């Protein structure tokens, strides 16, 4: 609405208008003020429309002049000027000759891998060290100990199986009893 006037400023203006004009005549004044602002906006829109129409007519006049000049053959288009410059064969030939010379000189490589020259690195000579393997120890007598260990393993699961059979019955909590709900119908009559 009004970008420079804030909300508090509008309240101050409304309070002053209420005091000066009075509560009886304030609605009539605001209605007339709204009609006046509407008329001003209408005039501004009409002026803008007429200005735009004149601009369109001037552009159309320029286009009409260009069309008439083309019909008469007096129109020099920018394309004709560009064609005249491109018609200079010596300049075009010179550009192509420069391009061919740079390609043939070897300064430009077709493949980027050919253009890259990696610096040559000297590889250090490999050093050979002879390492002796440690001697193996003879295997200890584990064969006699293994059957005894297996016997213990076999006996242990049997003992644990007996213990687990007795543990199968896990004590459980007794089922929880639910309290009876109070009836919604009242037995009391008044």
UniProtKB/Swiss-Prot annotation:
Recorded family membership: Belongs to the TatB family.
GO BP terms in the entry: protein transport by the Tat complex
Name under which the protein is recorded: Sec-independent protein translocase protein TatB
Annotated compartments: Cell inner membrane
The encoding gene: tatB
Record has Glycosyltransferase as a keyword: no
PANTHER family named in the record: SEC-INDEPENDENT PROTEIN TRANSLOCASE PROTEIN TATA, CHLOROPLASTIC
Primary subcellular site in the record, as a coarse category: membrane
Any one GO molecular-function label of the UniProt entry: protein transmembrane transporter activity
General function of this protein: Part of the twin-arginine translocation (Tat) system that transports large folded proteins containing a characteristic twin-arginine motif in their signal peptide across membranes. Together with TatC, TatB is part of a receptor directly interacting with Tat signal peptides. TatB may form an oligomeric binding site that transiently accommodates folded Tat precursor proteins before their translocation.
Membrane topology: Single-pass membrane protein
The entry's keywords: Cell inner membrane, Cell membrane, Membrane, Protein transport, Translocation, Transmembrane, Transmembrane helix, Transport
Basic residues bias (residue ranges): 134-144
Residue numbers spanned by region Disordered: 130-190
């Amino acid at each position: 609405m009004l970008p420079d006037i804030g909300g508090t400023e509008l309240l101050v203006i409304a309070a002053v208008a209420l005091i000066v004009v009075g509560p009886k005549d304030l609605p009539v004044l605001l209605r007339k003020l709204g009609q006046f602002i509407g008329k001003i906006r209408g005039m501004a829109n009409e002026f803008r429309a007429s200005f735009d129409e004149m601009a369109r007519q001037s552009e159309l006049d320029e286009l009409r002049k260009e069309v008439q000049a083309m019909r008469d053959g007096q129109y020099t288009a920018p394309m004709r000027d560009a064609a005249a410059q491109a018609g200079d064969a010596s300049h075009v030939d010179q550009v192509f000759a420069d391009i061919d010379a740079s390609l043939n000189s070897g300064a430009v490589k077709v493949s980027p891998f050919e253009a890259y020259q990696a610096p040559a690195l000297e590889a250090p000579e490999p050093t050979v060290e002879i390492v002796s393997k440690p001697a193996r120890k003879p295997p200890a007598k584990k064969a006699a100990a293994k059957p005894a260990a297996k016997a213990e393993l076999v006996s242990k699961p049997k003992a644990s199986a007996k213990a687990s059979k007795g543990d199968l019955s896990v004590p459980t909590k007794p089922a929880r009893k639910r309290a009876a709900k109070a009836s919604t119908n009242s037995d009391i009559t008044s």
